[in-house]
């Protein structure tokens, strides 16, 4: 992740909330420091944890936030939907009971997406197949899962022929 001190970090939680954090609000520390818990910087609720952070320098209509949930749902929302900040966070995606947000990324709308499951199953598709939705929408199915399977990772590439190794 590359960011300067005025970059905003969009912090997405497992419960589908988004929180905003300016890089300059994160205390500086040496490389041997223990760090500081995010709950001291962001107001998280009980059982909530940050699953991904996305740096944003500028909000525009040409970029999107792509999200994936544990149940295989994907959602693409225009970046400008996230520019109005609230201290207590905002809903980024509406989740079904028992579902969790597992990954997010900023895209230009033309990337290729890969969803990977705990069983080693993967689905690779063009992001153009996912239409843009409002901030509180639920999303669409990105991968069909068998019982006991869940998505563990969201990856993206700029070309269908790119090799993805994780």
Which ranges hold each PLM region?
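Duplex nucleic acid-engaging cores and interfaces of nucleic-acid transaction enzymes
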Residues: 1-81, 85-86, 97, 102, ...
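Extended intrinsically disordered, low-complexity coil regions enriched in Ser, Thr, Gly, Ala
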Residues: 81-87, 123-138
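Elongated, amphipathic alpha-helices that form coiled-coils and helical stalk/scaffold elements used
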Residues: 94-101, 144-148
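Membrane-topology segments of multi-pass transport proteins
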Residues: 106-108
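Intrinsic, low-complexity N-terminal interaction/targeting segments
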Residues: 150-153
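Single conserved hydrophobic/aromatic residue that forms the stacking wall/gate
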Residues: 156-166
